[in-house]
Regions:
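Interaction-mediating elements
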Residues: 1-67
Length: 67
């Protein structure tokens, strides 16, 4: 089961988060050649994050897939 976790320090509405999760699910399924019914996505917003000493808008994506 492919799993995509998206974390961002940006604030998104519930509608935006759900839309991002849905679009990401379809993209992962397409790119990996897997049925979307096996794909799981998670969106975490407003997370305390920093990169290179800077906390401007950023996101971290982690994709796990076996097989």
């Amino acid at each position: 089961m492919p799993f995509l976790k998206i974390q961002t320090n940006q604030t998104l509405s519930e509608t935006e988060s759900k839309s991002l999760a849905a679009k990401s699910s379809a993209l992962v399924a397409e790119q990996l050649g897997k049925p979307e019914r096996y794909v799981m996505t998670s969106v975490e917003t407003n997370t305390a994050m920093q990169f290179a000493g800077n906390d401007e808008g950023l996101a971290y994506l982690e994709l796990k897939s076996i097989g």
